Amino acid sequence: MSRSLRKGPFVDHSLIKKVRAMNLLEKKTPIKTWSRRSMITPEMIGHTFEVHNGKKFLTVFVSETMVGHKLGEFSPTRIFKSHPVKKG
């Protein structure tokens, strides 16, 4: 079930505060965050985020095509090792 349109997208308050401060100062340093649930908004375009995947921080550069998705979608938490190949 998707989020109600009247509520709008969820973005962590501390994260949006950091993005707005960076926009005012016109700085583009990476923003470290644990908020994988935050939705990417148009004002985040061009910023670099370091999103935590449970073990380490993965670098995510936000582009126009990412708007509307969540930050966690771009930092996978599981590593798939291929199935073993049977010899014989």
From Swiss-Prot:
One of its GO terms (biological process) is ribosomal small subunit assembly. InterPro entries: Ribosomal_uS19, Ribosomal_uS19_bac-type, Ribosomal_uS19_CS, Ribosomal_uS19_SF. It comes from the Bacteria. The keyword Ribonucleoprotein applies. Protein S19 forms a complex with S13 that binds strongly to the 16S ribosomal RNA. Belongs to the universal ribosomal protein uS19 family. This is Small ribosomal subunit protein uS19.
